[in-house]
Amino acid sequence: MTVVPAQQGGGGARGTSGLYDVLELVLDRGLVIDAFVRVSLVGIEILKIDVRVVVASVDTYLRFAEACNRLDLEAGPRKDPGLPDLVGEMTESGARGKSKGALSGAAETISDALKGSSSGSSSGSSSRSTSRKKEEQE
């Protein structure tokens, strides 16, 4: 009777892999951890966390970003205005209204002064009250 010794190791080609082999595989295939968290309270964005951890070659990352349409996170018409944008718009509109009111008031005062010096003081006060009524209606 003949005894054949059992072979050690399975059907794998190589029994060990080093750190170099693991890094080569990760860089070739890529490892991407992408997380997006938004916390809103009553429609106001309180916290926004957008994290992307990439361990990959540049080519692998660019293929991933193109596939997910994530090359530029904040671009495009879908970008929601944040709190600084909203505050800035309100400040600009308020300043625009105040400057418009100040300029129209200055122009009105000058025109009243010119009318008052040529026609008398009684007609000037009535036109001034009429213009104030128009301003209040607007």
Curated annotation (Swiss-Prot):
**What is the primary gene name for this protein?**
gvpA
> Which controlled-vocabulary keywords does the entry list?
Gas vesicle
Q: How does it assemble?
A: The gas vesicle shell is 2 nm thick and consists of a single layer of this protein. It forms helical ribs nearly perpendicular to the long axis of the vesicle.
Q: GO: which molecular function terms?
A: structural molecule activity
The answer to keyword Metal-binding applying to this record is: no
Species: Streptomyces sp. (strain CB03234)
Identify this protein by name: Gas vesicle protein A
Q: Supply any other comment.
A: This strain probably produces some gas vesicles from the probable gvpO-gvpA-gvpF-gvpG-gvpJ-gvpL-gvpS-gvpK operon; it can be induced to produce more under certain growth conditions.
Q: Does the keyword Manganese apply?
A: no
